[in-house]
């Protein structure tokens, strides 16, 4: 594991740091496993688009195979941000990427998966998609320090960064939304990126 210097929100980059002339970019990397990994490059923002390979979002990277890990490294990966709880990381670990020279940052957005249930009146409602918006708002509020930390890590990464949770949908989706909002993406672009997970979630679920 490569050590990294402490980072703070105060030194986060301006939106211009990720601007590039708009150009078609394939936003989904053909890597499996994981099943929900994609580049956040090529997303329209004011003045251009996000730079390809500055950040990826993903589902559980502990399942990555050697060929996929090698390809990520070849694409400039320098930093992994793990949003899972301590219990989740103890079950599956870091996977093969743990053997590569990348900085690893564990920034758990929840103390445990069960803590997500604590913020809804009826735990069964947690899986009601009509209530996802409220769940994400609660996650923004309760994990605000972690969101700031993760964004600062991405800003100061010497190469590309990838952040992930277990399915790459909720915690990862919240961080992706915060990141895209910070660099100037509009709500439609953020929702479009989030919706891409819908095409991949079945493969994540069967795994």
Per-region residue spans from a language model:
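Cys-dependent protein tyrosine phosphatase-like superfamily
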Residues: 1-161, 175-207
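Short beta-strand segments
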Residues: 164
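Ser/Thr-glycine-rich phosphate-binding loops at phosphate-binding pockets of nucleotides
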Residues: 167-172
């Amino acid at each position: 594991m490569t050590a990294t210097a402490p980072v703070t929100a105060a030194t986060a980059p301006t939106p211009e740091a990720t601007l590039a002339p708009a150009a078609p970019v394939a936003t989904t990397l053909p890597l499996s496993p994981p099943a929900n990994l994609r580049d956040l490059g090529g997303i329209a923002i004011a003045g251009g688009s996000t730079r390809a390979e500055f950040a990826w979002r993903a589902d559980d990277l502990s399942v990555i195979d050697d060929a996929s890990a090698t390809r990520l490294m070849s694409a400039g990966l320098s930093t992994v941000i793990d949003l899972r709880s301590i219990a989740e990381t103890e079950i599956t670990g870091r996977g093969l990427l743990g053997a590569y020279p990348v900085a690893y940052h564990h920034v758990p957005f929840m103390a445990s998966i069960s803590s997500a249930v604590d913020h809804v009146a009826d735990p069964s409602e947690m899986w009601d998609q009509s209530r996802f918006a409220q769940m994400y708002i609660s996650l923004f509020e309760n994990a605000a320090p972690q969101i700031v930390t993760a964004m600062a890590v991405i800003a100061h990464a010497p190469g590309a960064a990838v952040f992930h949770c277990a399915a790459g949908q909720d915690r990862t989706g919240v961080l992706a939304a915060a990141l895209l909002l910070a660099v100037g993406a509009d709500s439609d672009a953020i929702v479009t990126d989030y919706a891409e997970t819908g095409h991949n979630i079945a493969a994540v679920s069967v795994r």
